[in-house]
């Protein structure tokens, strides 16, 4: 099948999972699902948890499937090490990973590229204040954290300090971003292909950690209800944003569609979740790609 490497030619595969970030538990779930899929496909794949094993031991593998989420796995650090070791790996390289992890710098890059993204600013100190160009309500979040950890919707200045405190517990760089009223969508990217978009629906104030991984009432609408032209427009925008931020191989771009029908880029995820609640497998299934094939094709992107 096109894009799927021959297990006999791949060699040993390390599934890098777990780690020490705040997203360790999600990483273990993603990595476990990926490992099982690779083994079902006939690959010589093993779990490798850098919390318990030195990364130097990766020298004994031929390719690494990165299933780490958050710092130390999604921010370019492990990618840099693997580059030095000369071992191919799944997903984006050092630059794309670092930019994808840093929501503020990614936003600035998109703004400089003329891509639509909500107004935002960094918050600092014990008395954070919004600039005039960023009005309430806002979403306050750690600039370098995933899975919507540490995020709060803020309706007015009296709530800002507490939201800053919550976000700062995860990262010393805190971003305030203008709230976009409308519907949230996400687009998964696999190689050169934008997979069918997903429209997200949740009774929560936004698509937070609980909505992503715990809630049973979160709606994942795929197909999303967009017409063919709208679907193509959204897919092209997300591919452009992904490429502009240095993304490669596979990933996901989250967007909002405001009440006027305009798209707004929120963030890039260079190592999306692969759990039973995750979005990329849902989009792939809509495109006729089963989970095992999806995992094998992601591996194949690393070996192109």
Curated annotation (Swiss-Prot):
Function, in words: Cell wall formation.
Gene3D superfamilies xrefs: 3.40.50.20, ATP-grasp fold, A domain (3.30.1490.20), ATP-grasp fold, B domain (3.30.470.20)
HAMAP family referenced in this protein's UniProt entry, alphabetically: Dala_Dala_lig (MF_00047)
Protein source organism: Halorhodospira halophila (strain DSM 244 / SL1) (Ectothiorhodospira halophila (strain DSM 244 / SL1))
Name by which UniProt lists this protein: D-alanine--D-alanine ligase
Annotated EC: 6.3.2.4
Pfam families: Dala_Dala_lig_C, Dala_Dala_lig_N
Lineage: Bacteria, Pseudomonadati, Pseudomonadota, Gammaproteobacteria, Chromatiales
Binding sites annotated in the UniProt record for ATP: 134-186
Domain of life: Bacteria
Record pathway: Cell wall biogenesis; peptidoglycan biosynthesis
